[in-house]
Amino acid sequence: MPIKLPDELPATEILAQENIFVMKDSRAFTQDIRPLRIVILNLMPVKETTETQLLRLLGNTPLQVEIVLLHMSSHTSKNTSEEHLSLFYKTFEEIRDQRFDGMIITGAPVEQLEFTDVTYWQELTEILDWKMENVTSTLHICWGAQAGLYHHFGVQKHPLPEKMFGIFPHTLNKQNVKLFRGFDNYFHIPHSRHTENRREDIEQVPELEILSESDEAGVYIVATRDGRQIFVTGHSEYDPTTLQDEYQRDVNKGLDIAVPRNYYPKDDPSREPIVTWRAHANLMFSNWLNYYVYQETPYDLNNDKR
């Protein structure tokens, strides 16, 4: 089944060309079926890139999905046009009286700031509280995961001696977890961050369990025991060239940045990156939508009593 997108959204044409099953609003209106309502809180500066990455994965499932894109009204975007935001995005005030089957909260390049120093922190905490009553399951990514762990459970983030940057091997801590259905027992995921959540801090919170981690990259996936809140420290949604773009950006700025690990053949940036995470990215998003959203959400969201 397709992902339902506005006809004019730039990602619609990009994904259609990749054979991702996209259904335009005009066609979806004639189908007598309730799509899953997913709200994406996009905190990244270049919103078009992140929305396309996430929509690519959400569109590669057998479920029809209706997307609502959300941005922070308390922050002025410098890298995404006001026209794009006004055409395709909502503010929290516009959707706070609605309910959703699922939510994705993206990362943001603010991890080296204290949480309370982030300009939109107050608005974000309102959204984090709101989704506990109005969303069936939420997927938090990178800084979005750190923010959620801190706000809900007091789990601190810690600075790393150097940026965690590259593709790292991971293992599963628990078998028979629905989120990992179809996973290999050894898989690779991109990371790009200056801070971390530590195992010993998370283990102090009885409501949380660590589902996957890496000897090199540390904790990868944490979830509440009811599966409604999932926290992912890596970036399985990344395009093949995302780390390359970040590396070249920092090199051009004259920053002291290491070559992304396990990314280029023989660590040679002149060669094409090796993509080793795409299959597991698709599996994780598909499993989340199916088992944690579709199988758990009521048909009538307005009758959902949490």
From Swiss-Prot:
Subcellular location: Cytoplasm
Enzyme's top EC category: transferase
Pathway: Amino-acid biosynthesis; L-methionine biosynthesis via de novo pathway; O-acetyl-L-homoserine from L-homoserine: step 1/1
SUPFAM superfamilies associated with the record: Class I glutamine amidotransferase-like
UniProt site (Important for substrate specificity): 192
Residue(s) at site: Important for acyl-CoA specificity: 111
Active site: 142, 235, 237
GO MF annotation, one: homoserine O-acetyltransferase activity
InterPro entries referenced in this protein's UniProt entry, alphabetically: Class_I_gatase-like (IPR029062), HST_MetA (IPR005697), MetA_family (IPR033752)
E.C. number: 2.3.1.31
One cellular-component annotation, GO: cytoplasm
Residues annotated to bind substrate: 163, 192, 249
Function: Transfers an acetyl group from acetyl-CoA to L-homoserine, forming acetyl-L-homoserine.
Record's protein name: Homoserine O-acetyltransferase
Native species: Brevibacillus brevis (strain 47 / JCM 6285 / NBRC 100599)
